């Protein structure tokens, strides 16, 4: 099984565990608010601003080694469905790689792609597309 399949499987397992513990899983929806990572069009590279956001997340994860997160990668709607899903995964993988390089245990992190299925805005404009090109870190609780 390749890494992408394992990551997706891990995320599904975390989400299914959430279904059984609905009262505590509201935290699954908790996002590092104001700390989303944005990407350039059709790119998965992290810029300095994104790295600063991820440094904060890495510090928190290292201080809370019992906590797990899911990194969700997204794309704007301009590509094909397959391309956007692949790009979303590359973005999630880039975030995970940076967090791991920063000292976070890789077992704390699952990755998944949403592609362009959950847009940040309904604006079909350059500004809206910028908001769609993101990766979010969601905290999972047990």
Give the ranges of each region predicted by the language model.
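Sec-dependent bacterial lipoprotein signal peptides
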Residues: 1-18
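Short, flexible active-site loop motifs that bind/organize anionic cofactors or intermediates
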Residues: 8, 41-44, 82, 99
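Generic structural signal for beta-strand residues in well-ordered domains
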Residues: 11, 30, 62, 102-104, ...
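Periplasmic peptidoglycan-binding/tethering modules of Gram-negative envelope proteins
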Residues: 18-68, 136, 141-142
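Short, contiguous, well-ordered secondary-structure segments
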Residues: 49-74, 83, 92-97, 101
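Periplasmic OmpA-like peptidoglycan-binding domain that tethers envelope proteins to the cell wall
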Residues: 74-142
